[in-house]
Amino acid sequence: MQAATSRESYKIAADRLDEYVRGAESSAVATTAEDLLSVADLLRREPRLRRALVDPARSGADRADLLAGILGGKVGGDALDLLTTLVSHRWSAPSELLDGAERLGVAALLAAADKAGDLGEVEDELFRFGQVVAGQSTLSNVLSDPAAPAAQRATLAGELLAGKARPVTVRLVEVALGGFGGRSFVGALTRLVELAADQRDRQVAYVTVAAPLGAEEERRLVASLSAIYGREVTVKQSVNPEVLGGVSVQVGSDLYDGTVLRRLNESRNALAKR
């Protein structure tokens, strides 16, 4: 979790991004997102640069000038403005600046998809790919292996997604393969799904059932959860026959487990204590 100082600095840059997005075309925002992510990659490779850009002995203007001198002509003006905003404010640690730059790039990618009207589909594609990976242990191990070159894993993911996902989804999967925010691959995918939902002002509910919910069942569940959380909920279903029946719902840290498997386990435990 970022320190308060870093969170505030990120918020300032994120607000600047929101202002930019409101007046820009989707394609321009997507280009800016790529610039931001390329600089995040640069910061990942250059620890000395990260340290210099958070050095409290330098003024914010000095740090911004340093970055502008390095990036001049290599990224677009909008990306440079966002990045100099990012480094001109205080960060608690070099790693948190890296996380902030990467998060800003992801936010820009999601905003571009939103402006293009594709964000709901991108969110679903990320979730479905995560389900495919989670259901195949060999594939999960290959894509999650930090010892394997990221480019090689990205090529594999791209082949799996070819013709099945939008380019922005593929790009976000590449970000996840890089360990977005220091997470595992599956953890990064989950976080990206949640950020996509948040961009649409929605909360994600992960639902596990023995058989797929019908349209009316899902509608009632969405209505109930939205009323509870005071925010529209988007349901992501996972089918697991082992739960036997009922439904398990996880929203953030809240877990509602009404599966038959849970009730059977509780009954077994109660009998074992007699």
From Swiss-Prot:
Q: Which InterPro entries match?
A: ATP_synth_OSCP/delta_N_sf (IPR026015), ATPase_OSCP/dsu (IPR000711)
Is the keyword Cell membrane assigned to this protein?
Answer: yes
One Pfam family in the UniProt entry: OSCP
Q: Where in the cell is it found?
A: Cell membrane
What GO molecular function annotations does the UniProt record carry, in alphabetical order?
proton-transporting ATP synthase activity, rotational mechanism
Identify its protein family.
Belongs to the ATPase delta chain family.
- NCBIfam families to which the protein is assigned, alphabetical: PRK13430.1
Q: How does it assemble?
A: F-type ATPases have 2 components, F(1) - the catalytic core - and F(0) - the membrane proton channel. F(1) has five subunits: alpha(3), beta(3), gamma(1), delta(1), epsilon(1). F(0) has three main subunits: a(1), b(2) and c(10-14). The alpha and beta chains form an alternating ring which encloses part of the gamma chain. F(1) is attached to F(0) by a central stalk formed by the gamma and epsilon chains, while a peripheral stalk is formed by the delta and b chains.
Q: Please state what the protein is called.
A: ATP synthase subunit delta
Instruction: List the source organism.
Output: Salinispora tropica (strain ATCC BAA-916 / DSM 44818 / JCM 13857 / NBRC 105044 / CNB-440)
